[in-house]
């Protein structure tokens, strides 16, 4: 994967998250902000989830209250380089915990 392809895939990931939150109809308020390639989700309780891209490594990084995760693209899924979990699974687990209600991005 070259840099431009990586950025296209990361942009698609960011857009998917933003669109899902725009359509969010849960009781919790989840704000989404993108600034300089960093996507920040802010929750009512003051907690945050930070998602950023690491261009030199062609990775997406996810920082949550539970910890930090690094994802490599394998096939058509972003996969955690330590646990093998998918990006969507870990994001949904963290967002659900931080929002206090079930959050789905799929």
Curated annotation (Swiss-Prot):
Gene Ontology cellular-component terms listed: cytosol
Domain of life (superkingdom): Bacteria
InterPro entries with a match to the protein in the record: CyaY (IPR047584), Frataxin/CyaY (IPR002908), Frataxin/CyaY_sf (IPR036524), Frataxin_CS (IPR020895)
Keyword list, A-Z: Iron, Metal-binding
GO biological-process terms attached to the record: iron-sulfur cluster assembly
CDD domains listed in its UniProt record: Frataxin
Organism: Salmonella arizonae (strain ATCC BAA-731 / CDC346-86 / RSK2980)
Gene name of the encoded protein: cyaY
Protein's recorded name: Iron-sulfur cluster assembly protein CyaY
PANTHER family: FRATAXIN, FRATAXIN, MITOCHONDRIAL
Signal peptide residues on this chain, from the entry's feature table: none
Family: Belongs to the frataxin family.
SUPFAM superfamilies given in the database record: Frataxin/Nqo15-like
GO MF term set: ferric iron binding; ferrous iron binding
Record function comment: Involved in iron-sulfur (Fe-S) cluster assembly. May act as a regulator of Fe-S biogenesis.
